[in-house]
Amino acid sequence: SLPNMVIAEGKNSSQIEALLDLAFSQTSPFAIRYPRGSIEYNCDHKCDVALGKWEFVVNNIDSKVSIITYGNDVCKIEKDINDNHLPYNLINALFIKPIDEELLVSIARLNKPIVVYTNDIIKGGLGDSILECLNKNHINAPVYILGVDDIYVKHGSVLKVKESLGLDLNSLYHFIESIC
């Protein structure tokens, strides 16, 4: 990617609006990704975002795993964690580049598995950036990256494509149970 390029994806309309405001105040290239399909709309809730800072959405003291993801999956996973009392931490990596090294290092020091859940290609994506950061900081943490392999993906509805790739939320939760 371009030097000093910022890549971000909000979890809902408020975050996307805040990212737009932030992008206009920057001098470096700034890409805001948006999902195919719909996104949660919440016009009555303003939010602030700081460049390169992630959001700790769910912080469970008794967590078995930390899930790092971004986009509209954050809201869906948060609802599942809260509704089903799942012992998971959830981090919204709304900045895919640059990553929040400070928060990432603190998560890695919990000595719990980290699952990076993306809807994008694995090579060169968020998971690779996370591994690079942990390596740079000499942290050996169990990191699992769930994303799209280096393949051609058939077209279809978002849900059908995710199911065919094993990237639907049920597959995520089954994977987490298999490693914990």
Which residues are covered by each model-predicted region?
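Conserved glycine-bearing catalytic or ligand-binding loops at nucleotide- and phosphate-handling centers
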Residues: E9-F24
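Thiamine diphosphate
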Residues: S1, F24-C180
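Flexible, glycine/proline-enriched loop segments at strand-loop-helix junctions
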Residues: P3-G10, K162
